[in-house]
């Protein structure tokens, strides 16, 4: 940004726009649910429902998904040296909006909860 002379989407303490999560946690999640795939997640300050805006975010950051929470979670975890992973279920695609979000919300929450519960259960081993 103009204030800190870094490109849009990058925090000055990071070498690029990508915020790292804890690889071992992400790898474990994919072992639990092999259908999970790594994606580039754009994290912004507002919900984007407009398909044209979603396409712009995709083109600007090569993002597969966009949402509002990931950057805050990863930044806080990294700053406090706490392991972090993100399991995101796409609940509204580029063409979808609030209606699609409501239809898939419960299924997405159940899958995410299952992954987290299994990882936490395995931590004591």
Which ranges hold each PLM region?
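Mid-sequence, gly/pro-rich, charge-dense loop/helix-turn segments that line enzyme active sites
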Residues: 1-61
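Short C-terminal domain-edge/linker segments immediately following a structured domain
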Residues: 3-13, 70-73, 116-121
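Generic non-transmembrane alpha-helical segments
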Residues: 24-35, 76, 114-122
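A C-terminal functional module that forms or caps the active site or interfaces directly
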Residues: 47-95, 99
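His/Asp/Glu-rich mid-to-C-terminal helical/loop segments that flank catalytic regions of hydrolases
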Residues: 94-125
């Amino acid at each position: 940004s103009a204030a800190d002379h870094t490109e849009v989407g990058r925090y000055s303490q990071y070498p690029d726009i990508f915020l790292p999560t804890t690889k071992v946690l992400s790898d474990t999640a994919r072992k639990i649910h092999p259908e999970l795939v790594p994606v580039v997640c754009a994290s912004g300050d507002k919900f984007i429902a407009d398909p044209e805006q979603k396409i712009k975010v995709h083109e600007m950051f090569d993002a597969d998904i966009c949402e509002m929470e990931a950057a805050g979670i990863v930044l806080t975890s990294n700053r406090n040296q706490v392991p972090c992973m993100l399991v995101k279920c796409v609940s509204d695609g580029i063409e979808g909006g609030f209606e699609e979000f409501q239809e898939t919300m419960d299924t997405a929450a159940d899958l995410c909860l299952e992954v987290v519960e299994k990882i936490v259960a395995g931590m004591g081993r």
